[in-house]
Every structure is written in structure tokens, then in C-alpha cells.
Amino acid sequence: MSREEKERLKSLVFKLTGVEVNGLAGLYVYFLLLATAWMEEGGIAAWLIPSEFMDVNYGAALKGYLADQVTLIRAHRFDPDDVQFGDALVSSVVLVFRKTPPPAAHVVEFTFGGSLTEPHARDFIPREKLRESRKWTVYPSHAKNDRHTISDGTGPMLGDFFRVQRGIATGCNKFFVLDRAEAANLGLPDKYLRPILPSPRHLKTTSIDTDDDGYPLIERQLCVIDCNLPEPMVEANYPALWRYLQTAQTLGIRDGHLIGKRTPWYRQEQREPTPFLCTYMGRGANDKQPFRFIWNRSKAIGTNLYLMLYPKENLAAMLNRHPDRAEAVHALLGQVTGHELRGEGRVYGGGLNKIEPSELARISAAPFVELWPEIGADVQSQRKLFG
């Protein structure tokens, strides 16, 4: 959908419903809202839509609409492991509501798993509780719906001690990321190569040592091309790099959206190495973490398949004074339960879990403060000061 068409729909939705839709919302959100505006008052609707809106910030407008402007009767979420559509890994929910304002003390039936007629779990959630809930997928509680949030936004959170940022998006890993040995054979200059971690599925360890050059001591050492020189200077001073870059044209790589926005086009996003990373997606049930936390002692950065955790002021100062505590920090990250990680993240069809930087930042960091009270001394005041 073009930007112009999305703006037209946003304006139309606001005119007809008063709802301000986030630009990241999927087309189904506009469709549901506009179709409901067309409905007769008192009419009943049943929708089968992706359940992602129940978890994400850009779903807040639809959740608010369902809680405040119509009477939500039932929400049935299918078990993400039970894929409903063979050609789409999407988690699904059936919504049933009446186009009338909700009565006082209204409760909504939430069901999970199985079928509409024979769900695996059922609960009745007061509307007021829904209005205060960031994530609706925590309802109803069930062994397979193991999505529990611990942080209520008032206690210490990982975001108080780490700046969480996605790794770099190169635009074409197959071109920009090379084996270290291959880069050497091509004669590419070391000064314009940076160590980078392999894809999480190829990283078999959660503790990475370093060699003398800052490369991780793992089976396959990789590097990413990252050069800030304009093309004439590369051509004049680094002929091997220039020859390699010329192959991008015949491969059609320079036509990519992300690459086309960069100047020069072979300059990567800038990230410093960090001692801690978290994989961005994964699977896991019960207490098993769907994501892995990595202790990185090399100078390697990560691609956008990783979240990079940069220690903030108090934690960074403690680690500077006591470098030996980095291992304990990694151990505490490894103790975050799979339930909480899934609760703060989002789940897709087939049971694939993902977590964004803001979601990881909301994970409770109470164990950090219990072990090192000094790092939590002014967390609340800093949060109020900087939001």
C-alpha cells in the first residue's frame, strides 16, 4: 500500500470513528474500523484477523476501540503452534463484538487454543482490566499460553541499565558480509572491515572469546565491509576494494532500498561492539528461553538478527570498576524466564517468537538491583528526568 493511500485511509478512519491509527498498523486494522463504521447500530460482527495487534504498540488504537467504542463479546486466539493457514505464518484471533457502547462493568470472554466451540482455556476479563493491559495475549491463563509479564513499569527494568538497539541492516549480507579468509584472499583492506557475528543459528555458543585482532574465537570468522571514503578515493587508493564494489552493479545490489539511501552506499550503520547481545527471534516453551543472551568479549558487532545491549551509566561504571562481574551480568540475563520473554515479545504462527528493543527493555531487572543495590540508587529519578 502506498504512503498516499495509507494517509487517505488514516484520514477516513479518523473522520468516521475518531480513531488515530498508527502508521505501522496493518491493512486489516483500517478494514475492520471502516467496515464497523458502515455497520448498523446494534449489529454484530465476527472477524478473523492477525492477533499481532494484541501485543504491539501500534495495535493500541484498535484495542482502545474494542474496549471503549463497541461491546467486545469474545476474543478467541488460536494456539500459535496450530497454524490456521498453510501459506502464512500468522497467529490468528476471532473477534466477536456488537456495535454499541459497552455497558458498565462489562466483562469479555477470552478463549485460547483448540477450536471456537471447544477451546482449551476460557476466562472472563473485566473491560477495565483490558483498558489497562498493554498485551492482551496474556489472557486467558493456560499452560500453553505461557505469556506472563512481571514488570509493571514501576520497578527496575533492563532498559534502566542497558540501551537496547538492533544490530546493523546491511541491505545485502551476501555481498557485504564475507569470511575473514575470503576477504584476505581478495586483498580487501583490514581498516575497512569490521568483525561481525554470524547468524544466531550458526552461533553455537553463548560465551565468545576474542583473538588478538578482536575477531571472535569461533569456527567461522566473518567481517563486514564498512568504508566511509567516497568512490574516487576508494578507486585511487584501494584497487582491490574498488574491484569488489564494482561487482555490486552487475548483481543489482545497488538498486536496493536501504543501500540506495546510504552515502556512500557501502557505508554501514554505526554500532560499537557491546559485551552483551540477545537473539531477536527463536522458539521455546515453558521455562526454555526463546532467545539467547550472548556474552561477547570480542570486537564483533551483530546484524539485525541480534539486539545489542549497551550498559548504561551505573552498570557501565560498575563494570569498569569490576570487570569480573560481566560474567555475573550474563548469568542474570540467562535467568530471565522464558515465560517473561514470551510475555513481553510477540508470537507468530508456528510458534516463532520475536522481541523488539523496547520490549526487551521492559523485562524486570529486579535481580540486578538485589545483587548490586548501588546501581539502582537513582533509577527512578533518572527515569522521571529522561522519560
Regions from the language model: what does each represent?
Residues 1-176:
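Signature of N6-adenine DNA methyltransferases within the class I
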Residues 146-386:
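Polybasic, glycine- and aromatic-enriched phosphate-binding surface used to engage nucleic acids
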